[in-house]
Amino acid sequence: MGIRAIVVDTAGTTTDLNFIQQTLFPYSAKVMADFLREHQHNPLVDYCIGDVRDIALETDADIDRVAEILVQWIAEDRKVTPLKTLQGLIWKQGYANDEFKGHIYPDFIDAIKTYRAQGLRVYSFSSGSVDAQKLLFSHSDSGDLTELFNGHFDTRTGNKLDKQAYANIVNTISLTPRQILFVSDVVEELKAAEAAGMITCQMVREPSQRTGKYRIIQSFSELNFE
């Protein structure tokens, strides 16, 4: 049957990890407290604030304390939905104000155009929210790439280290697991995707990166589906 869809990780795969860690994360930490104070009556922000209180078991935490918790979670790279939702809202503000452009590796930009021309479907799966992924790809340093994607998945689909998340993706896009290629730089994510039956491939952008028993590529140009 062959590959009919490609699911790509973002940080470290389509996007320089340094952009996430040195630009996006610090920006969200810097403005978090002010953002919460300004938007605390927005229903979505208010819901996220309540979710943070519940997860942290601090139901009486005021806005400043909630901001402290969130900044700590950013430092710990916690993959919790309220944090990722709030970061997406904050980054939307940053992109709109031209604080930064989304970094996308040039080889992926060329590749995704080729994949779509070949009739392949392309999806992204990230611990960042779907909205944050759309922002990244719509405000990239090479323009708006969102029309080239068939969809995006985030923590609402499941934890990226959990087999069930990939099974959920398989069910959502209505293909068999062996018709889907998952590309990531993280060995544990590849292991979970493989357990769900997907074909896997590891992106190795850095020589010091930990590798596993998977096919290794250093660029999307090395993937050919003709």
Swiss-Prot record:
Subunit annotation: Monomer.
HAMAP family the UniProt entry points to: Salvage_MtnC
Cofactor: Mg(2+)
Keyword terms: Amino-acid biosynthesis, Hydrolase, Magnesium, Metal-binding, Methionine biosynthesis
Superkingdom in the source lineage: Bacteria
Primary role: Bifunctional enzyme that catalyzes the enolization of 2,3-diketo-5-methylthiopentyl-1-phosphate (DK-MTP-1-P) into the intermediate 2-hydroxy-3-keto-5-methylthiopentenyl-1-phosphate (HK-MTPenyl-1-P), which is then dephosphorylated to form the acireductone 1,2-dihydroxy-3-keto-5-methylthiopentene (DHK-MTPene).
Cofactor binding summary note: Binds 1 Mg(2+) ion per subunit.
Cited InterPro entries: Enolase-ppase_E1, HAD-like_sf, HAD-SF_hydro_IA, HAD_sf
PANTHER family documented for this protein: ENOLASE-PHOSPHATASE E1 (PTHR20371:SF1)
Pfam families: Hydrolase (PF00702)
Family indicated by similarity: Belongs to the HAD-like hydrolase superfamily. MasA/MtnC family.
Statement: the UniProt record of this protein carries the keyword Cell membrane: no
Its EC number(s): 3.1.3.77
Matches recorded under SUPFAM superfamilies: HAD-like
Top-level EC class: hydrolase
NCBIfam families in the cross-refs: enolase-ppase (TIGR01691), HAD-SF-IA-v1 (TIGR01549)
Protein's UniProt name: Enolase-phosphatase E1
GO terms assigned for molecular function: 2,3-diketo-5-methylthiopentyl-1-phosphate enolase activity; 2-hydroxy-3-keto-5-methylthiopentenyl-1-phosphate phosphatase activity; acireductone synthase activity; magnesium ion binding
Catalysis performed (reactions): 5-methylsulfanyl-2,3-dioxopentyl phosphate + H2O = 1,2-dihydroxy-5-(methylsulfanyl)pent-1-en-3-one + phosphate
Organism from which the protein derives: Shewanella amazonensis (strain ATCC BAA-1098 / SB2B)
GO biological process, one term: L-methionine salvage from methylthioadenosine
Pathways involved: Amino-acid biosynthesis; L-methionine biosynthesis via salvage pathway; L-methionine from S-methyl-5-thio-alpha-D-ribose 1-phosphate: step 3/6; Amino-acid biosynthesis; L-methionine biosynthesis via salvage pathway; L-methionine from S-methyl-5-thio-alpha-D-ribose 1-phosphate: step 4/6
